[in-house]
Amino acid sequence: MAIKTMTNNSGGGTWSEGWHQLTIEAAEYGDWNGTNFIELWFEGYPKTFKLRVYEAHNKETHEEFALAKLFKLANAGIIDKVKSPSGKEAIQYDDDASGLVGKQINGYFYKDGEYVRVSDRIAPVAHQGNVLSYTEDDVHFWKGVTEKHIASRKQNAPAVADTTSNGSEANVPF
């Protein structure tokens, strides 16, 4: 026998469910069956833990919005605010994936079977920027959007049958 030590975690570590402030360590574009995506890796986490955000387009305007929202909420590649042809305010940004590196986001970790994953719905980090700024209220709003999405996914997930038994047949060896 020997004297040993072990960690004494209280459940609030780097893998606990909930919100985590993440720093993007690497980002690159990819393609899956003709759909573009950006994959993100984070400082302090293994390369096997990543976030993949797929492009999505508005059915009426055909404008891509999912990757654009990633750049906007990460405050990455933001150049300026401009007026769109329709007169609405628009954000001009550079979509080079390297612009995401070093940026901080709030990511929501959730349990998916045996694994922890990060939601593709992120929230910004409160900060004052040259073009875009996010307040604590903005962060709270985007976190609420994500939490509502996660709750909806859990509610719509197929039910898993409970195969445990507490009856007398539980002691039958066959």
Predicted features by range, described:
Residues 1-174:
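Short beta-rich binding modules
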